[in-house]
Curated annotation (Swiss-Prot):
Residues annotated for heme binding in this entry: C486
Organism: Catharanthus roseus
SUPFAM superfamilies per record: Cytochrome P450
Pfam families: p450
Entry's Gene Ontology molecular function annotations: heme binding; iron ion binding; monooxygenase activity; oxidoreductase activity, acting on paired donors, with incorporation or reduction of molecular oxygen
Family: Belongs to the cytochrome P450 family.
Entry-listed glycosylation sites: N88, N137, N325
UniProt-recorded name of the protein: Cytochrome P450 72A225
Gene label: CYP72A225
């Protein structure tokens, strides 16, 4: 009897313990759910509304926050509508390439705020404030890369603070002007091979003239330049890497033009599986090239004058100078980091120069008087000889033309930064957690800054240099500005000058009747339907 009572008592104790346990689990589950719900509510509504209130108190104007989507719905609709309608061949392109931003500035003034989903972004168009943002790069940082961006490349363009400083320091030798001189033959060879294809088309034409969409040819030429200058003797492997990188970018653009949300890359769709497979192939191919180069350098072979060789040499010297001090984690790059920099060479180097060249050819076609002046300068300096480095840097008319094209059609039409803490910008006390947008093209086209002819193609405005054209104001920054100015800007300018000199030596060109003027924004500012020209062999 006593035993039975004891057993029953123990059963009741265990039952109560289990009851307490399950109640505890239930309470913890409820607390977790409430915490998660609170975080979601704060992210989706409370925090955006608080930030909106702060921004309005600063005198900034913008649309009221819409739950989750913000201004994205209207932006997407206006972009879609704008892209469906080509425009006359004028340089008044802002309403087409960024219609929502154009509308919001007209409605709310030059410094409004917009909503990227639940995240507000303040538009800054004051030159002095933009200068401050680009100069103080430790305060105003690059936005973190999302999953799609990481598939293309990371590299110095994506890093901040000490990591950015280290990579920039190690990359600088590769883009020193003395190193660029050694890359000039690669520029010449790649462009000459493109022009041989054009000459073949001219020979096949009974009239001696032919129509050609020059845009894909320029893309192929600039990718060939990057392959040669980045990997040198590994040219074919480099070209294959570029093809894979280009395919990834095409997939990403298709995703962005349909519907993208964070975490999408975890879905097992056919496209995403293909993207991940390509990314692994690119990683493996670049690593293979790097390891072969490292082994060759260890065996005493020269590092070569290509970008990879110079980067590896710079990296090894930094590690050696550290004298094996393993405590210095900021010394040198890992192989993974070198891979990302090589991927960035492709992505940034090819796009920038290709779009600069295509808009230059189109504008010189529209303005034959400037095409003639540019050609006369090239023939006077080079004749039909191969352009050399020193003379390329003395092409005044060509430089004026390029600067004006970069003003009207900057490859990077918009820049963004984020602030993580409350920050004073001019008279604005901006709250931490917001983005800052710097619309490069809007300053480049601003009639209050450049005059009534701001949207006209007038290279003569740069006849006495950039400083004189801008009257010392910070209103021209096609390659960004401050410490983070594009590290490859001299590379791009030299390549563009070489290509233009060779094209002008061999061809005259005019706009084809089939050309449709439709600038649009992907990663850079591109011609949506190509760039059809009529070319004449000289």
């Amino acid at each position: 009897m006593i035993s039975t009572c004891h057993s029953w008592h123990m059963f009741q104790i265990r039952n109560r313990e289990m009851d307490v346990f399950y109640r505890g689990i239930s309470v913890l589950g409820t607390c977790f759910f409430l915490l998660l719900a609170w975080k979601m509510l704060n992210w989706a509504w409370i925090k955006p509304k608080k930030l909106e209130k702060r921004l309005r108190q600063l005198g900034l104007k913008g649309n009221s926050y819409r739950l989750l989507i913000g201004d994205l719905g209207e932006t997407s609709q206006m972009d879609k509508e704008a892209k469906s309608k080509p425009i006359n061949f004028t340089n008044h392109i802002i309403p087409r390439i960024m219609p929502f931003l154009h509308k919001i500035i007209q409605s709310h003034g030059k410094n409004p705020f917009i909503w990227q989903g639940p995240n507000p972004a303040v538009i800054i168009t004051d030159p002095e404030l933009i200068k401050e943002v680009l100069t103080k790069n430790y305060t105003y940082q690059k936005p973190p890369s999302d999953d799609l961006g990481k598939l293309i490349s990371q590299g110095v363009a994506a890093y901040d603070k000490d990591k950015w400083a280290k990579h920039r320091r190690l990359l600088n030798p590769a883009f020193h002007i003395e190193k660029l001189k050694h890359m000039l033959p690669a520029f010449h060879l790649s462009c000459s091979e493109m022009l041989k294809k054009w000459e073949k088309l001219a020979s096949a034409s009974a009239e001696g003239s032919f129509e050609l969409d020059v845009w894909p040819y320029l893309q192929d030429m600039t990718s060939d330049v990057i392959s040669r200058t980045a990997f040198g003797s590994n040219l074919e492997e480099g070209k294959n890497i570029f093809k894979l990188q280009k395919e990834i970018l095409e997939h990403i653009l298709q995703i962005l033009q349909s519907f993208y949300f964070p975490g999408m890359l975890y879905l097992p769709t056919k496209r995403i599986r293909r993207m991940k497979k390509i990314s692994k192939e690119v990683h493996s191919s670049v690593l293979n090239i790097i390891m072969k180069r490292v082994e060759a350098m260890k065996a005493g072979e020269p590092s070569n004058d290509d970008l990879l060789g110079i980067l590896l040499d710079s990296n090894f010297k930094e590690i050696e100078n550290d004298n094996g001090n393993n405590s210095n984690k900021n010394c040198g790059m890992s192989f993974e980091e070198v891979i990302e920099e090589c991927k960035l060479f492709y992505f940034a180097g090819q796009e920038t120069t290709a779009v600069l060249l295509v808009w230059t050819l189109l504008l010189l076609s529209k303005h034959p008087e400037w095409q003639m002046r540019a050609r006369d300068e090239v023939l006077q300096i080079f004749g039909n000889s191969e352009p050399d480095f020193d003379a390329l840097n003395h092409l005044k008319v060509i430089t004026m033309v390029i600067n004006e094209v970069l003003r009207l059609y900057p490859p990077g039409f918009m820049m963004s930064r984020v602030i993580h803490e409350d920050t004073k910008l001019g008279s604005l006390s901006l709250p931490g957690g917001i983005s800052i947008f710097l619309p490069t093209i809007m300053l480049h086209h601003d009639e209050e800054l450049w005059g009534d002819d701001a949207k006209e193609f007038k290279p003569e405005r740069f006849s006495e240099g950039i400083s004189k054209a801008t009257k010392g104001q910070f209103i021209y920054f096609p390659f960004s500005g401050g410490p983070r100015i594009c590290i490859g800007n001299n590379f791009a300018m030299l390549e563009a000058k070489m290509a233009l000199a060779l094209i002008l030596q061999r061809f005259t060109f005019e706009i084809s009747p089939s050309y449709t003027h439709a600038p649009h924004t992907l990663v850079t500012l591109q011609p949506q339907y190509g760039a059809q020209l009529i070319l004449y062999k000289r």
